[in-house]
């Protein structure tokens, strides 16, 4: 039989445990940024592009729970990586269009030697977000591609419209490209179904927040994807295409993260013939 003292001790321990988890998931982890460094093998990558770096930021969700100061911190961390390119993979605000101008202003401080590129997410107003970012020198790609040159060598940077809120068209996006390497920005990883049959080499996606809440030994109980937790976060190989799903830096629905730290990813491109 459990004594009154044992019951009280157990109850107090339970309450303290719940409070500790709550404090961690609400106050600590949502601001505890993880920086990942990942090498990506690209078939037939021109020699002049070997070692090119791309920093990815995703799912900023600027709102009262993701304030400007935190975005400033993320921008400083990206700039400290000295990337050649910055890729922004959608969902810049959450809940209100009033935050569009301020997130664009903060992102205008990003420094990249060869450009800052973006695609839209399902929370982004197309016209207002595209206009605000373009005004700050950020190129928004909507079912289109551009060549990126280093002397006579080049590859393609492409971006698609959002799978849910837009009109994603991979055929239009790639129309007119040749057999040179293709790097694709895409908000929703579910779009890999449409992409994996193309000759896109590398896809950067977001959207999932890594589930935002992950349970030890189980993983994320909820992921907003038709595939469940299959593409929750990390590196995936689909046919000849490599896809990386970034956990993002913001939050949605609830201002918490648990075992799904906000993430900035730095990719280094190398020829697929080179050792990893």
Language-model regions, residue ranges each:
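Active-site neighborhood of phospho(di)ester-bond hydrolases with catalytic His/Asp-centered motifs
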Residues: 57-58, 86-90, 115-122, 141, ...
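N-terminal signal-anchor transmembrane helix
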Residues: 29-80, 96-99
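N-terminal secretory signal peptides and thylakoid transit peptides that target proteins
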Residues: 1-18
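Conserved beta-sheet core of the metallophosphoesterase superfamily
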Residues: 189-268, 273-274
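Catalytic metal-binding/acid-base residues of hydrolase active sites
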Residues: 61, 93, 123-124, 145, ...
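Beta-strand-turn-beta hairpins that frame and shape the catalytic cleft
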Residues: 42-54, 146-157, 238-242
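Core catalytic region of metal-dependent phosphoesterases/phosphodiesterases
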Residues: 63-149
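Binuclear metal-dependent hydrolase catalytic cores centered on His/Asp/Glu-rich metal-binding motifs
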Residues: 128-131, 135-138, 142-144, 150-186, ...
């Amino acid at each position: 039989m459990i004594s009154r003292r044992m019951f009280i001790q157990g109850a107090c321990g339970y309450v303290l445990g719940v409070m500790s988890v709550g404090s961690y998931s609400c106050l600590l982890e949502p601001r505890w940024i993880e920086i990942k460094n990942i090498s990506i093998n690209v078939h037939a990558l021109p020699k002049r592009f070997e070692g090119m770096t791309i920093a990815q930021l995703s799912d900023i969700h600027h709102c009262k729970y993701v304030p400007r100061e935190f975005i400033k911190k993320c921008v400083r961390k990206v700039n400290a990586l000295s990337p050649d390119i910055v890729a922004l993979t959608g969902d810049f605000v959450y809940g209100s269009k009033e935050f569009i101008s301020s997130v664009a202003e903060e992102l205008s401080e990003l420094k990249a030697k060869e450009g800052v590129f973006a695609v839209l997410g399902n929370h982004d107003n197309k016209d207002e977000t595209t206009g605000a970012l373009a005004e700050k020198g950020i190129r928004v790609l909507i079912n289109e591609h551009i060549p990126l040159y280093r002397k006579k060598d080049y590859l393609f940077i492409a971006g698609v419209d959002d799978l849910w809120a837009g009109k994603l068209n991979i055929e239009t996006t790639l129309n007119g490209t040749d057999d040179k390497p293709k790097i694709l920005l895409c908000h929703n990883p579910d779009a890999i179904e449409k992409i994996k049959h193309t000759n896109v080499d590398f896809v950067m996606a977001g959207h999932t927040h890594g589930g935002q809440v992950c349970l030890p030994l189980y993983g994320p109980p909820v992921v907003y994807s038709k595939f469940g937790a299959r593409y929750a976060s990390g590196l995936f190989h689909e046919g000849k295409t490599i896809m990386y799903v970034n956990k993002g830096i913001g939050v949605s629905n609830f201002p918490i993260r648990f075992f799904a730290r906000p993430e900035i990813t730095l990719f280094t491109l190398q020829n697929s013939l080179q050792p990893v």
